[in-house]
């Protein structure tokens, strides 16, 4: 699914939705994303899925936690392509690239590959996702963690990357420095913000579309390999 990952960002800048200074900052730091993807591909032996930069801050709220919100710095979402075929694309938010440290950006990129592989695995097994809608952000974090493949299996050739994931995802993504910068330089300046309901990060796919997911044989074989590899303990938790 070839496309320019910066198209939506460029459109937002041209429409005056994103200040030129912020746009230039993201462009200047975009090499961190490119470097991270190359690193992840080398460590996993897989091509990274299609991705794009979402020119907004994406936050989520729940009905039972008044005044509280969580930030989605990245998401892996299903898309319907040509001939009604199912695919997945990674959405990276502009604030992540603008204000994230290298370790945080690389950890999140790696985490989204873990999401991508887990979603493909579940679709291939025709595992219809019809779970209960989580009632709180806390429940959503741990629900997300339940389904992911092991980072130490997927990225076993890059111990430093695994350490980044373990550090940034102790029990859900945490980076107070980046979160403060995002609030100060993005949210408080009223730059584009998208508010999603808490269940927006639950992927629901009709079974007829599952049958139309085209998966490269290399990915199929890698998923089987990852799933059959045992590790001593599960340390890294996973949520963006």
Describe the role of every protein-language-model region.
Residues 103, 123, 127-240:
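Metalloprotease/metallohydrolase-associated module, dominated by Zn2+-dependent proteases
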Residues 21, 25-28, 97-105, 130:
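Conserved aromatic-histidine-acidic binding/catalytic patches
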Residues 104-112:
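Short alpha-helical catalytic segment bearing the HExxH-like zincin motif
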Residues 62-103, 116-124:
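Active-site scaffold of zinc-dependent metalloenzymes
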Residues 50-61:
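Long, charged, glycine-rich C-terminal linkers/tails
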Residues 4-10, 26-30:
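Charged, helix-prone or intrinsically disordered regulatory segments positioned adjacent to compact structured domains
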